[in-house]
Amino acid sequence: MATQAAPASGVRNGAGPEWGGFEENIQGGGSAVIDMENMDDTSGSSFEDMGELHQRLREEEVDADAAAAEEEDGEFLGMKGFKGQLSRQVADQMWQAGKRQASKAFSLYANIDILRPYFDVEPAQVRSRLLESMIPIKMVNFPQKVAGELYGPLMLVFTLVAILLHGMKTSDTIIREGTLMGTAIGTCFGYWLGVSSFIYFLAYLCNAQITMLQMLALLGYGLFGHCIVLFITYNIHLHALFYLFWLLLGGLSTLRMVAVLVSRTVGPTQRLLLCGTLAALHMLFLLYLHFAYHKVVEGILDTLEGPNIPPMQRVPRDIPAVLPAAKLPVAVVNATAKAIAVTLQSH
């Protein structure tokens, strides 16, 4: 048995060359036992790897959705921000335009330097121009000088308003559609501005050398005669006295204006049209102011009918010529005072 085993082992040990390499590979392959201590503890199982991969994919999807949402929000906010910025720019432009217009209007109407040349006049000059407005000029061969200021004419218009108010109150005038002050201001300023504009238009048609400012000054100083006539005749009511002052004082101021326009107009037809229109309007306006806002004060009849007659039964009438001329002003003033007292007591 030993002899049989020996060859067998010898055969195994002494195998042919074809088996030598295989045996060496088997012997050199090492042990089949796995050393668990040499394994890496950080390496996970396949299930753990799949979980991590799934979690990573979910995080990437969430990040992609968040990025898409942020992009959409950015686009929406960008459009909204653009519209808001555009509206703010439009509002800012409108505000700036309105501010510029308001500043221009304020600078135009509130700057006193613009109006200073029209009211920069000495009282002595105004007094001399008032006297000159009642003196007609004789030389009409060359254009006469016209004052280019508005202080004197404006003060004369306000004086006429005050005199007209006095005449309305003493004549017991009733204005149903407005106050006495509004009616007086509208009448005086309406005549001054309206007639000046109309005469300036006619002067332009007739080729007269006069400006609107000069026309306002000329007509304004022409109201000086009206103020004197109305102030006297509102306190002393005599038709003869009124017509005398109307022709004398009103005629002198009208002739002064006519002479100035004649000196600045070329052609007889143009002169007749322009000067005739101005003279007619100026003289008729004085008649209107006298007869439209004035009647005899009812208290004057106290000297004729007695103070016991009710005011509603009185009839306006002229003062008879029986009163002496020297006592007439005193009698009229006394009667006017009595009339005012009776009227106040009756109301």
UniProtKB/Swiss-Prot annotation:
Protein topology in the membrane: Multi-pass membrane protein
One Gene Ontology biological process: cell differentiation
Key words of the record: Acetylation, Cell membrane, Cytoplasm, Differentiation, Glycoprotein, Golgi apparatus, Membrane, Transmembrane, Transmembrane helix
Gene Ontology CC annotations of this record: Golgi apparatus; plasma membrane; transport vesicle
Lumenal side: 167-184, 235-237, 293-347
Modification sites for N-acetylalanine: 2
InterPro entries (alphabetical): tRNA_Mod/Golgi_Maint
Residues exposed to the Cytoplasmic side: 2-145, 206-211, 261-271
Location of the protein in the cell: Cell membrane; Golgi apparatus, cis-Golgi network membrane; Cytoplasm
Region spans: Disordered: 1-28
Entry superkingdom: Eukaryota
Transmembrane domains' residue ranges: 146-166, 185-205, 212-234, 238-260, 272-292
Name the record gives this protein: Protein YIPF3
Lineage of origin: Eukaryota, Metazoa, Chordata, Craniata, Vertebrata
Gene name tied to this protein: Yipf3
